[in-house]
Amino acid sequence: PLQHGSTEILKMMRRGITRERTDDLIKKIKDINPDISIRTTLIVGHPGEEEKHFQEMCDFVSRNKFDRLGVFTYSHEEGTHSHSFEDNVPETVKRKRYNSIMSLQQKISHEINQEKVGKTFKVLIDRGDKNNYFGRTEFDSPEVDNEVIIPVKNSHLRVGEFYDVKIVSARAYDLVGKIL
């Protein structure tokens, strides 16, 4: 996990990397494999995190456009270097920052998903009900990532099997497809 987009906060966390170096690594990875999906987690409200640090993280997220992003609010965790710091960011501020990053990521996720419309993916079917089957692409983890929703329409798909699915529409966190 990258955990933050501010070099100052990364230093306080003892992550051993700067925001600039992280940006460079992400760029190199995407240059080598433009189709790669990059996922990470971030922490908002780390002790000492000021508005400028939070804005650096927002800029970091906007610049790197992560395919999948989880955000957590800071809480003391024994055995970490940060446990020795005073937890000085109010919970209301942490929650506001969490919501801001998630709102930003929702827009990014929707943009990324829109780019998938018209493309075909191998989709693993996870489950179904009377109206739809639900699966995921090779880029997605179960339960936490995008689902591909496939209307039943006389299809008899088997859970645990892969199918070629053309994406016909996109939402922020889900795709809708049809079996080819």
Give residue spans per PLM region.
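Conserved non-cysteine loop/helix-boundary elements of the Radical SAM core domain that shape
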Residues: P1-R68, Y74-V93
